[in-house]
Amino acid sequence: MNALFAWTDGACSGNPGPGGWGVLMRAMDGDRMLKERELSGGEAETTNNRMELMAAISALEALTRPSEITVTTDSAYVKNGVTQWIHGWKKNGWRTADRKPVKNADLWQRLDAAQARHQVRWEWIKGHAGHPENERADELARAGMAPFKPARVSG
């Protein structure tokens, strides 16, 4: 049986500042890789949390049909937000338990819509801990950020 996996990561130089997101996607048949796809992008002025969210959103929006997928992130913010907090936020009109507007509500709503048509299993792993797929997602996020970083002036 084929299985889909995505490893996602966000990066930011300054917080806020230029940022990028990266996704490594794989379709597997047991131990055999059927297909691999890499995605990345970035923004000139953003935050690390927004880039982490964009990575997860981009992975799910890249799927052309309803799918079962395991999304692995090193962001506890994304994992906890999408598996625990989002239900209360939706019930409270996108407000937190203390009635404050949810930060990044635009992206949380987009992530909620993106995952609605899929069966998503969310996993968290420690970042920068030697997981090759997570390291690749990090490289992609940094590549996505690169066009938005100011050029260094040497002299």
Swiss-Prot record:
Monomer. HAMAP family: RNase_H (MF_00042). It is an enzyme of class 3 (hydrolase). Belongs to the RNase H family. One of its GO terms (molecular function) is RNA-DNA hybrid ribonuclease activity. This is Ribonuclease H. Keywords: Cytoplasm, Endonuclease, Hydrolase, Magnesium, Metal-binding, Nuclease. Disulfide bonds: none annotated. GO terms for biological process: DNA replication, removal of RNA primer. It catalyses: Endonucleolytic cleavage to 5'-phosphomonoester. Mg(2+) 2 binds at D9, D138. Its cofactor is Mg(2+). It comes from Paracoccus denitrificans (strain Pd 1222). Binds 1 Mg(2+) ion per subunit. May bind a second metal ion at a regulatory site, or after substrate binding. The gene is rnhA. Pfam families: RNase_H (PF00075). It comes from the Bacteria.
